From Swiss-Prot:
Residues 2-146 form the Globin domain. One of its GO terms (biological process) is hydrogen peroxide catabolic process. One of its GO terms (cellular component) is haptoglobin-hemoglobin complex. Involved in oxygen transport from the lung to the various peripheral tissues. Heme b binds at H63, H92. Belongs to the globin family. PROSITE patterns: GLOBIN. Heterotetramer of two alpha chains and two beta chains. This is Hemoglobin subunit beta.
Amino acid sequence: VHWSAEEKQLITSIWGKVNVADCGAEALARLLIVYPWTQRFFASFGNLSSATAISGNPNVKAHGKKVLTSFGDAVKNLDNIKGTFAQLSELHCNKLHVDPENFKLLGDILVIVLAAHFGKDFTPECQAAWQKLVRVVAHALARKYH
């Protein structure tokens, strides 16, 4: 994947302002609320019975932070995203059996969360760069699937 200097700048400038805990928790909560079938991968997380329960669930918050922290590794390694996510791809494929389509859904939700948090700073050009990034990350995570 080729990244232009402008794309890299747009991605890193937003990433530098992201509150990983808040945005990660919000993104994962939105995934579980908007696409309820994804909840089956989080049965051990406890109460996921309503939007309020999901948004307040400490396990959702903690895992959301973990997910977005990993996403930060992509931002730091834009030229080697496949390598960066090789182990996570194997884990999600072979051990957790996560539907790889869910990576695309979460990526799209992350773009929505960033747009909501950054408003006019999240320009269409910025959105395009982030949309490209979430697609590349989703593809890297789905790589170990057969």
